[in-house]
Amino acid sequence: MSALSVIEQRLLKWDKLASLVPKSKKTPFPIDRLNELLKVCANSSYLRIGESIHAHLIVTNQSSRAEDAYQINSLINLYVKCRETVRARKLFDLMPERNVVSWCAMMKGYQNSGFDFEVLKLFKSMFFSGESRPNEFVATVVFKSCSNSGRIEEGKQFHGCFLKYGLISHEFVRNTLVYMYSLCSGNGEAIRVLDDLPYCDLSVFSSALSGYLECGAFKEGLDVLRKTANEDFVWNNLTYLSSLRLFSNLRDLNLALQVHSRMVRFGFNAEVEACGALINMYGKCGKVLYAQRVFDDTHAQNIFLNTTIMDAYFQDKSFEEALNLFSKMDTKEVPPNEYTFAILLNSIAELSLLKQGDLLHGLVLKSGYRNHVMVGNALVNMYAKSGSIEDARKAFSGMTFRDIVTWNTMISGCSHHGLGREALEAFDRMIFTGEIPNRITFIGVLQACSHIGFVEQGLHYFNQLMKKFDVQPDIQHYTCIVGLLSKAGMFKDAEDFMRTAPIEWDVVAWRTLLNACYVRRNYRLGKKVAEYAIEKYPNDSGVYVLLSNIHAKSREWEGVAKVRSLMNNRGVKKEPGVSWIGIRNQTHVFLAEDNQHPEITLIYAKVKEVMSKIKPLGYSPDVAGAFHDVDEEQREDNLSYHSEKLAVAYGLIKTPEKSPLYVTKNVRICDDCHSAIKLISKISKRYIVIRDSNRFHHFLDGQCSCCDYW
């Protein structure tokens, strides 16, 4: 059925309802008929017609007597379902007498509007007034509001209260009770409640499992699932979907395969929702080809399944494949939704493809998802990671609603672009709006302090503000402090901090300190740190490379040879440097000394041209990092054809003069390329942005935004 047909049917229904509303204000209309009309208006959100009926009841004096409670309850139901909670409460407060339906309708109204605290407050008023005895519907609403607001202690008190009234025997009360315990406690309390219940069916176990899944208590969720197996329950569709979701989060492929086999055996694998759960599970378990097979075998293609398979490729870091799937979609038959756009924009962000991101932004605007928070967050992320922090700011400013993810994305984006002060200003604005920072927020803030050398302020955020906002520091926060201190040249403080910190350091922390030693030329400490890190993490290639670079900078060629020999003996492979640039909606990828590109001869000629132009400006090849066992000329050639230089050269050939270039590299940009590209930006009068594994480098007129520290 087309959208136009739906609208036409809705208008016909509206006209029919409107014709039934009494026109005479003096003649009472049959009450039963009016109540039926109010019910239809409430369920269809026809507020204006409902208001007309309310007006008729007032003028015919049918809404102020105690015996008219049924009509008033119908009106309360209308207003709460039309999100007019304040008007519903006015009616409720003016009622001469209230019954349990009145209380329950008002509670549900508050709950549907997200005011769970008001629900619990209203229940307490009902309980202490003694006007009405709670029933199973009231108990369900109360337990649900405890779940929504995380008020487990109050929930336990209400549990005792409803036990006294004998309401726990009702199936849906039991289900919401168990869900509350599993969601809010996150421990074995729900299982203990299950054991204490006189009767449990599959729906109760499903509620417990759903709660544990929501709060991330996957071990307890697995215990519940085992109980369902021990009780010999016949699983239904919900059980299978929940179990797949559980195994997705546990990344337990073996158990997931057993469930998939069982689904096939009992015919539960053909439903669209089940196929989506299977695709999601295989994607999370790193088996994207299995996910593709499930997708290919599904006959009912829709946006839910298309988005799920794209997400599977996104989880697998196969970002280009996710984008290719979208290009094959018939967007007229299967229009993208907010989840589709979020996955696509985040895939583009990981690939740093600004032009493609701009095109997709246009489609977002056409599709009407401009004001959706999830899409807005993805747009900010895409522009920030694609090198245009200015467009990220515009996307951020244009958002009608923002959440913690929005602020975190903006703070992190500014930080990675080296705009530390702007990141800290965004943090201050976030606090001013009342948003509560989380662990991700403080990672961005501490990195920002590190980029601009705000040591004291960074330590204040770490020691004071994180405690104030009840954020427990983890390994990433501690590593940020190591970077903050060592980048400022405070190596003694960094060593003391690492020695006394109450955590076990990982290889990233040691690499952070080692990189600072390399950049700050503290080679003595660098060698000491590298030797310790190699002993503890013998398979991490990054540590070997940094140690080799330290030896090379010191002209200790024997040390370089020793490190490379050690890597060969241990089978440790250096991650190859790869750079890419987007030209006319196509991505061009380059390796060092690449000879695979169809225009490589032209590219090499351009490299030679620009290198000859920058030498008179003071460029001197940094041959320390090149192979020492070849002659000087060969070393210079090796450096000339690094992947980032090839990408920049291709951009200079293929883009209009004075247009900006955006290049991405998978590892840290080398010292020689950094020096060269600074001067290339000067002679070409180009704005060149390079994103490496550490940060963004904005090259303009012979300078870089990183101030030669990265």
Curated annotation (Swiss-Prot):
Tagged with keyword Acetylation: yes
The family database entries (InterPro entries) matched by this protein are listed as:
DYW_dom, E_motif, Pentatricopeptide_rpt, PPR_At4g14850-like_plant, TPR-like_helical_dom_sf
N-acetylserine occurs at: S2
Note the segments forming the PPR repeats.
Answer: 35-64, 68-98, 99-133, 135-169, 170-200, 201-235, 236-270, 271-301, 302-336, 337-371, 372-402, 403-437, 438-473, 474-504
Q: Which residues lie within the region annotated Type E(+) motif?
A: 585-615
Region annotation (Type DYW motif) ranges: 616-710
UniProt superkingdom: Eukaryota
Q: Where is this region: Type E motif?
A: 509-584
Gene Ontology biological-process entries: RNA modification
- GO MF: RNA binding; zinc ion binding
The question of whether S-adenosyl-L-methionine is a record keyword is answered with no
Q: Which Pfam families match?
A: DYW_deaminase (PF14432), E_motif (PF20431), PPR (PF01535), PPR_2 (PF13041)
Which controlled-vocabulary keywords does the entry list? Acetylation, Repeat
Q: Could you say which protein family the record assigns here? A: Belongs to the PPR family. PCMP-H subfamily.
Q: What is this protein called?
A: Pentatricopeptide repeat-containing protein At5g39680
| Provenance organism | Arabidopsis thaliana
